[in-house]
A protein has these predicted regions:
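Extended two-metal-dependent nuclease catalytic cores across DNA- and RNA-processing enzymes
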Residues: 2, 23-24, 74-249
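A broad, low-specificity signal for short, low-complexity segments enriched in glycine/proline
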Residues: 13-18, 63-64, 88-91, 197-199
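Short, intrinsically disordered, charge-balanced linker/junction segments flanking boundaries
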Residues: 254-262
Length: 262
């Protein structure tokens, strides 16, 4: 069966930047993130052996999530200058190597990945999502697996359950309960991975947890009841969009490798 590789370029970029010591050209231009990224790209291509592929980056500017919740990602520090200046040349090099580079304004890289994986299902193609972002685990099913950037392991449904304690179809509930400090999404105070997984295992989704909240005892019960008003918004913020139109990609044929690419 044909296979589509979707690379979370923004996630890879930051990991590459922090993985290597600062490197520069003879004229002082930083290149460490570029070098690290290209090495990771080569490794993941070898591991996944795709027939089609795309590297997806976040677009600059705000997205529909900022419209839903203006404080979304408000606590993030600005991108370091020595990383920012590497983005444009990196995108050009990746494209020159034969990869399809996608940047879609108004949505995040996660949403492009989700929408392309949905397109792949419609076309009968399996997807490999290369990322270190736990949010994308919600996409995993019989047609989608995660290739973790940290340990180069593939995670199917059983792998997601083993790693997080919840199945992929409950990852949205799990993520909403915990919130996300990096993205400034409030969760239930004091609810970490173990508590979130316990509630999901015991009660099920957010609606069932909400129904059980009045009977929950102790401080964590108080925290849950206090956080209930925001839970629906948290669910919306952590849900990956899977129905976005991707400019330049009408079918997976637009993501095919030509002979000698990559």
């Amino acid at each position: 069966m044909l296979k589509l590789l979707l690379i979370d370029g923004s996630n890879y970029l930051f990991r590459a930047y922090h993985a290597l010591p600062p490197l520069t050209t003879s004229t002082g231009e930083p290149t460490g993130a570029i070098k690290g990224f290209l090495g990771m790209l080569s490794r993941v291509h070898t591991l996944a052996k795709p027939d089609m592929a795309a590297v997806i980056f976040d677009a600059p500017g705000k997205t529909f999530r900022h419209e839903m919740y203006p404080e979304y990602k408000a606590n993030r520090p600005p991108m370091p200058d020595d990383l920012r200046v590497q983005i444009d040349p990196l995108e050009k090099v990746v494209a020159a190597l034969g990869w399809k580079v996608l940047i879609v304004p108004g949505i995040e890289a996660d949403d492009v990945i989700g929408s392309l994986s949905a397109m792949a299902k419609r076309e009968g193609v399996k997807s490999v999502v290369a990322t270190g972002d736990k949010d994308l685990s919600q996409l995993v099913d019989d047609d989608v697996v995660i290739l973790n950037t940290m340990n180069t392991k593939f995670y199917d449904r059983a792998g997601v359950i083993e790693k997080y304690g919840v199945p992929p179809e409950r990852m949205i509930d799990y993520l909403a309960l915990m919130g996300d400090k990096v993205d400034n999404v409030p969760g239930i105070k004091g609810c970490g991975p173990k508590t979130a997984a316990k509630w999901v295992a015991e009660f099920g989704g957010i609606d069932a947890i909400r129904a059980a909240a009045p009977a929950m005892k102790g401080k964590i019960g108080e925290n849950l009841r206090a956080g209930l008003p925001f839970l629906d918004e948290a669910v919306a913020l952590v849900t990956v969009k899977c129905d976005a139109e991707i400019p330049g990609v009408k079918s997976l044929a637009d993501l095919s490798f030509a002979p000698g690419d990559a």
